[in-house]
Amino acid sequence: MAKDVEGPEGFQTRDYEDPPPTPFFDADELTKWSLYRAVIAEFVATLLFLYITVLTVIGYKIQSDTKAGGVDCGGVGILGIAWAFGGMIFILVYCTAGISGGHINPAVTFGLFLARKVSLIRAVLYMVAQCLGAICGVGFVKAFQSSYYDRYGGGANSLADGYNTGTGLAAEIIGTFVLVYTVFSATDPKRNARDSHVPVLAPLPIGFAVFMVHLATIPITGTGINPARSFGAAVIYNKSKPWDDHWIFWVGPFIGAAIAAFYHQFVLRASGSKSLGSFRSAANV
C-alpha cells in the first residue's frame, strides 16, 4: 500500500506499507474467477515460453550442423539462445504480471510461497499449470519440427560431458538464486511505491537475469533454473539421459529459490521476521 507524503524539499514522494502475508491456506480462493484466470495465464505463458525457446535451440542446432548442410558458427549461437530465453521472460512477465504475477516457473512460485506472497492452493495450481503448459509448448515444437526434434535433442536439459553431478547441481542452485533474488528485488513493495510509474522496471531485470544465467550455465546443464521447462522437454523427448539427470533440475532450482527467499525476507528485509511469525501462526490455526 502506498500513499503520497510531503518530502523534505516540498516534493511529493510515495510512502509505503508492506502488504500483509498471504494466508498459508485460503480455501476462499477456489471460489474466485481471478484464481482460475491467473492459472490459465500461467499455462499459456509457459506454453509460449517453451515453444519459442525450444524452437530456437533446435533451429540453432540445425543451422550449425555441418553434416546437414549447416556451417560452423551458424545460427544464433549460445548468445542468441540466451537472448531468446531472457527476451521471452521479459515479454511474458510484462504481459502476465498484472494477472498472475508472471511466475512462469515453479521455482519462482515456490520462492514466493515461502515468502508468503502466494497461498499454498495458488502455488500448487500454478506449478501444475506451468508443467502442463511446458509439455504442450514442447509438444507443439515436436509436431511442427518432427524431422529434426529427436535428431537434435528436443531441447532437453542434461548434464554435459565432463561435468559431475555436484557441478551441475551447484550451477542450478546458484543460477536459480540469481533469478529468484532478482524477482524479489524487482517486485519489492518499496521499489514499486517509488517506481510504479515505470511498468517495465520489474520485467526487464528479471529477463536480463535469465539471459545472464543462460550465458553462464548453458555449457554445463543447458540451463534449467525452471523445473517446468526441464520437465516439459524431458516428457516429450523421453530419452534416458535427460531423465537420469532430471532430479538436478528440480532439486537445484528449489534449493536456490529457498535460499533467495530466506536471504531477501530475513536478511535484507526487516519485515521478514514478521512474515515468519505470521506463517507459524497461520499454520497453528
From Swiss-Prot:
Family: Belongs to the MIP/aquaporin (TC 1.A.8) family. PIP (TC 1.A.8.11) subfamily.
InterPro entries attached to this UniProt entry: Aquaporin-like, Aquaporin_transptr, MIP, MIP_CS
Domain note: Aquaporins contain two tandem repeats each containing three membrane-spanning domains and a pore-forming loop with the signature motif Asn-Pro-Ala (NPA).
TM annotation in the entry: 38-58, 75-95, 124-144, 166-186, 200-220, 248-268
Organism: Arabidopsis thaliana (Mouse-ear cress)
Motif NPA 2: where in chain: 226-228
Chain residue ranges for the region called Disordered: 1-22
Tissues where this protein is expressed: Predominantly expressed in the root, with a strong expression in the cortex, endodermis, and stele.
Known outcome of mutating R194A: Reduced sensitivity to cytosolic acidification. Insensitive to cytosolic acidification
Residue intervals on the Cytoplasmic side: 2-37, 96-123, 187-199, 269-285
MF GO annotations: mRNA binding; water channel activity
Record's keyword annotation contains Coiled coil: no
Residues that bear Phosphoserine: S278, S281
Annotated compartments: Cell membrane
Positions where N6,N6-dimethyllysine occurs in the chain: K3
Intervals, Extracellular compartment: 59-74, 145-165, 221-247
Known role: Water channel required to facilitate the transport of water across cell membrane. Plays an predominant role in root water uptake process in conditions of reduced transpiration, and in osmotic fluid transport. Its function is impaired by Hg(2+). Inhibited by cytosolic acidosis which occurs during anoxia in roots.
Protein name: Aquaporin PIP2-2
GO CC annotation terms, alphabetical: endoplasmic reticulum; plasma membrane; plasmodesma
Impact noted for substituting H197A: Reduced water transport activity. Reduced sensitivity to cytosolic acidification. Insensitive to cytosolic acidification
